[in-house]
Amino acid sequence: MKISVPISLNTLEHCHRDSLLKRLSQLGAEEVLLCYAALGFDAFVEEERAASIIKEYDAFLKGHGFQTAVWASTLGAFAHSGYTPLTTINGKPLTLWACPMDAGFGKAFCRVIEKIAALGIGKIVLEDDFRMQCCEGDISCFCEQHMKFYSEYLGRAVTREEMKEGLFDSAPNQYREAWMAGCRKGLEDLARQIRASADEVNKNLSFVLCCGPALFGGDGTDPEALRNFLSGDNAPAQLRLIGAPYWSVFNNPLNAVIDFPRRQAFECSKAGIECYGEGDPYPRPRYTCSATEVEFYHTVLLADGHCDRLFKYGCDYTSSFDYEKGYAERAEENRELYAQIKEMFHGKKCVGFHPLEPFDKVKRAHRLAMAPEHAVMDTALRRYTSSLSLPTAFEKGGVNLIFGENARCVECEDLKYGAVLDMAAAMILQERGIDVGIEKTVKHTPGETGHGLPVYDETYFEEKEVVGLYGKPVSCLDLVLKAGAKEESKLHIIDRDYTGSYTYENADGRRFLIYNFDMDEMVKTSGWVRSYCRQAQLARLYPWLNGSPVDAICLGNPDLYLLAKKDDNSLAIGLWNYSKDKISNPVVQLGRRYATIKIVGGEGRLEGDKIVLTTQIKAYEFCFIEVTK
């Protein structure tokens, strides 16, 4: 995985070049990105001086063997400039953002592209403000130009109020189609203009589009389509993924975040698109986001193997290159580890549970959020897999994990691998004519529970344990199950018992484990998902659901992240301890027996179909294991 390091132009004004070269060497950089805010309100240096710095350091860095590129802001760089701002559905102008349908904006931005290209730069990175959602408020854009487009699309004049009412109706409809078409047109037309402007100067100029979360459905287009518009005849565009170490600063655990860029990288690999990971600890320094989190991110993507490059933001955007040295020093310390991970995991395929979560679910969902980008950013499914330390693989074949609106997108044929459903997904599949073992339901909403006391609990029959359930009141269903369904756990809520979870095989041979609650509602609540019994139940039932055992699972360690990959002869396992607690003598249950074992970052042995580590995995440390037949 090649390393690219972003450097802000203003830090180059008075930099010590020896310090810069040292940090780049420590980070393992092959490419340096010169970050320029383009002409906008937050431009670090004025335009003429910026051009001078870019030329000077482009030559200097190339002279020291580095590749170079310029990074430019896009829709977020023209605040208070007189261009049409993005406008929310409530009519609020977002003055820090320009609307891509403004022809004047398009011309101005393309002029920036031409000027950068004229400096002899061969690659331009477009900031992840190339988007229309996830800006400052409610969904966009509802400026006059977009409203005119919606009216023409629908064949009659419409108001913002009518669009709002239609958009948040319970099902996809003409208003949602019009809104997504308007977003798509604005961004795709601008991408075409940018490519045409680049070709005027250099047909071999390439682009890297930094994805924002809204590009995955919320903006009506997708990264691959935009990438195609930005690609030249001899210059295929690349993508920088979204989902970074700094998301953990905003209450998104990194062990839950990491499967988002992993999934994007998998899709890029299938499509033959070169991609970069977003190894960003913004806002630096390590007081905010630790080097450990950056290394967690780096090593997971390296082991996964689908990400070609990594943006490693190891230098501060304001201070000197000697102010924050920790990110670079930690990367230098781990250089040998990177080589060991690559050797151990390279050439193998990820195995485990299959999270079924299509990127275009905003288009199909019956519940559109006011911030639709959240439908892909922080999902119940990723919180679930990280809470239970489940190995995940994005290629079909493992037990499917299907929650909520995702059930509208599942192909019936894929259910042959088995599926875990929440009740929302089960109801959707039943509406689609798929038998999930429910004869009849009566919705029941218990009253208030008091002051967070565990007056809910769940009894697991096979695990022989009762688990307290905390949190808000929950709506559940009083289920009458069909013959053949087996109750696996029982919910006791205030004064009544309900089915907690059950297994069922229908006449088509499709096997299910179904929870009697909505995962979106309860995934962050103690006991409902973050539970040793929930984890043990899954491990026990995987062979029944899928027809083959899970290749590797490690029970009983909160916030352990596990990744598994195998080939015909061996299995590689990565264990990342994202918990504040150490893990003493962890045991990894394997799907079969192996003959030999190799461990990096610990010691241990094979015992039948288990790996028993005899050393600890301390908080925020990792261990890598390879077993062979």
Describe each PLM feature range.
Residues 373-377, 394, 401-625:
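A conserved amphipathic helix/loop scaffold
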Residues 20-21, 37-88, 190-198:
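Aromatic-lined substrate-binding rim segments of carbohydrate-active enzymes
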Residues 15-40, 115-123, 235-239, 297-309, ...:
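Catalytic domains of carbohydrate-active enzymes, especially glycoside hydrolases
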Residues 67-121, 128, 132-136, 144-147, ...:
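Active-site-adjacent "subsite" loops/lids of carbohydrate-active enzymes
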Residues 10-26, 103-116, 221-229, 290-301:
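Short, acidic/polar
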Residues 1-12, 67-74, 125-129, 174-222, ...:
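Aromatic-lined carbohydrate-recognition surfaces of secreted/lumenal glycan-active proteins
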Residues 3-12, 38-51, 91-110, 171-188, ...:
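The substrate-binding groove and active-site-proximal loops of carbohydrate-active enzymes
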Residues 35, 122, 127, 133-134, ...:
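Hydrophobic targeting/anchoring helices
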